[in-house]
């Protein structure tokens, strides 16, 4: 996730913003870290974006759970976004980026219903490996995300993420 965010956030946020991606070793480590970081971060004008894979969770319940962890810090300038269902769904939503990253032709797949709504794919990583057998999560994230177009992605969760980040950075800071 960090690799992708490091590459795509500069395409979304103004140049006047800086950001830091903090990876966590698993979802429980992230959940434990949220209240600590949101309460303890003393630097002024800091905004938090928390990104979490949906996997098999109920999206709305997961998002509510993460916002509840933030509530105790009284920090309002925080955005929670859920990737449905895996990060690879975002890649499958932009097959042009996959084509460019792996120098292959995927035009036969672009019209398929499955790739017009990649968020419904239960195992996006496996589906991506069917298209790109050499795909590996970390190197593949770097390879594909550098070609991602933030304005042309069939993943609804990606588009909601982009929209949320844009709205967060245009709001006045506390």
Please provide the spans of the model-predicted regions:
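C-terminal accessory helical subdomains adjacent to catalytic cores in phosphodiester-
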Residues: 2-22, 28-49, 54-174
């Amino acid at each position: 996730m960090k690799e992708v965010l490091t590459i795509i956030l500069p395409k979304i946020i103004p140049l006047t913003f800086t950001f830091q991606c903090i990876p966590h070793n698993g979802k429980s480590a992230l959940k434990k870290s949220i209240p600590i970081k949101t309460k303890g971060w003393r630097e002024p004008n800091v905004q938090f974006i928390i990104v979490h894979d949906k996997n098999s969770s109920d999206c709305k319940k997961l998002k509510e759970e993460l916002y509840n962890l933030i509530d105790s810090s009284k920090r309002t300038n925080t955005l929670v976004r859920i990737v449905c269902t895996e990060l690879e769904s975002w890649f499958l939503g932009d097959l042009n980026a996959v084509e460019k990253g792996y120098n292959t032709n995927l035009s036969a797949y672009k019209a398929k219903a499955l790739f017009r709504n990649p968020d419904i794919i239960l195992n996006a990583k496996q589906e991506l490996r069917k298209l790109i057998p050499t795909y590996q999560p970390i190197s593949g994230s770097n390879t594909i995300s550098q070609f991602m177009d933030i304005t042309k992605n069939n993943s609804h969760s990606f588009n909601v993420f982009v929209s949320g980040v844009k709205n967060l950075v245009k709001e006045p800071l506390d």
